[in-house]
């Protein structure tokens, strides 16, 4: 009873609010964690929150590329996506993971609907770094009206981070899921964006989690080399969000059962909170 009473102030704050969740890491692979995640989403939905889920799939993509004898290449945390690789990326993200997750959430009681960024021009993109990363793209436009219609009709959108390219015959673009989640959160004026990861949050030089950061803190940590690899695009996304209308961004440990509920409905929360240097 105490847990429920303690959560009431947070339920009042978040009821009716859009919460964007980037779903990835162990929570996307471990069967027990998948089930806890699904239950968290159902509870959020039943309490009147409006979850929007963008999923990754890097490990599954790498596994499929290995099976097909295609090398996985990365630069500064971004995948270099050849035409051959792009076909595999879309097959795994849109054809496998998206449908599996949608079915799984529906089974647990959410009204989930799966889609990719190609649907209704949800995500439009151009080649990142003038094509140096192949079919890895950067988002140029988001169609929020389509998503808002889906949300306001009582559905939970499950989005694969594939964007529409130039022309009908274009393969489309592979979008970093963290960046896609950020653009969607901004377009929807989301209350929060939450990134599920396989670490306890952003770690300092002693590998201890940092409870809160501002964009200037993040810049300093990058200069010191504390932040690197796949954490770079994740934190770039967080900074972009909090500087463009999203109240707070959170990086939390998806390996902890019910991590979403712990972040949203408890005073202490978990992981690292990023805010824009004003009031926390």
From Swiss-Prot:
Residues that hold substrate according to the record: 57-58, 79, 174
Recorded metabolic or biological pathway in which this protein acts: Amino-acid biosynthesis; L-arginine biosynthesis; N(2)-acetyl-L-ornithine from L-glutamate: step 2/4
Keyword Amino-acid biosynthesis annotated: yes
Signal peptide extent: none
Residue(s) at site: Transition state stabilizer: 22, 234
A Gene Ontology cellular-component term: cytoplasm
Transmembrane segments: none
UniProt cross-references to InterPro entries, sorted A to Z: AceGlu_kinase-like_sf, AcgluKinase_fam, ArgB, Asp/Glu/Uridylate_kinase, Glu/AcGlu_kinase, NAGK-C
Keyword Transferase among UniProt keywords: yes
GO biological process: arginine biosynthetic process via ornithine; L-arginine biosynthetic process
Keywords: Amino-acid biosynthesis, Arginine biosynthesis, ATP-binding, Cytoplasm, Kinase, Nucleotide-binding, Transferase
UniProt-listed SUPFAM superfamilies: Carbamate kinase-like
Location in or out of the cell: Cytoplasm
EC number(s) given by UniProt: 2.7.2.8
Catalytic activity: N-acetyl-L-glutamate + ATP = N-acetyl-L-glutamyl 5-phosphate + ADP
GO MF annotation terms: acetylglutamate kinase activity; ATP binding
HAMAP family: ArgB (MF_00082)
Summary of the function given for this chain in its UniProt record: Catalyzes the ATP-dependent phosphorylation of N-acetyl-L-glutamate.
Family (UniProt): Belongs to the acetylglutamate kinase family. ArgB subfamily.
Record-given protein name: Acetylglutamate kinase
Lineage: Bacteria, Pseudomonadati, Campylobacterota, Epsilonproteobacteria, Campylobacterales
Gene that this polypeptide is encoded by: argB
């Amino acid at each position: 009873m105490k847990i429920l009473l303690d959560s009431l102030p947070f339920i009042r704050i978040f009821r009716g609010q859009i919460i964007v969740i980037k779903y990835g890491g162990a929570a996307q692979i471990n069967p027990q964690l998948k089930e806890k995640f699904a239950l968290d989403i159902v509870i959020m939905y039943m309490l009147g929150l409006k979850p929007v889920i963008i999923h990754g799939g890097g490990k599954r993509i790498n596994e499929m590329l290995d099976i097909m004898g295609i090398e996985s290449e990365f630069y500064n945390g971004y995948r270099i996506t050849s035409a051959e690789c792009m076909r595999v990326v879309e097959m795994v993200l849109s054809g496998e993971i998206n449908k599996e997750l949608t079915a799984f959430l529906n089974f647990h009681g959410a009204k989930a609907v799966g889609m990719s960024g190609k649907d209704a021009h949800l995500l439009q993109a151009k080649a990142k770094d003038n094509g140096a990363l192949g079919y890895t793209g950067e988002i140029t436009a988001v169609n929020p009206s389509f998503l808002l219609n889906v949300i306001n009709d009582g559905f939970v959108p499950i989005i694969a981070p594939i964007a529409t390219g130039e022309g009908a015959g274009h393969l489309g673009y592979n979008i970093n899921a963290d960046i896609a989640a950020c653009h969607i959160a901004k377009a929807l004026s989301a209350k929060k964006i939450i990134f599920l990861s396989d670490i306890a949050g952003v770690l300092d030089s002693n590998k201890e989690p940092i409870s809160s950061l501002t964009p200037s803190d993040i810049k300093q940590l990058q200069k010191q080399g504390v932040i690197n690899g796949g954490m770079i695009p994740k934190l770039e996304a967080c900074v972009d969000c909090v500087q463009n209308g999203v109240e707070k961004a959170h990086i939390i440990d998806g390996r902890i059962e019910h991590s979403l509920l712990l972040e949203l409905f408890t005073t202490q929360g978990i992981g690292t909170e990023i805010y824009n240097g004003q009031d926390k």
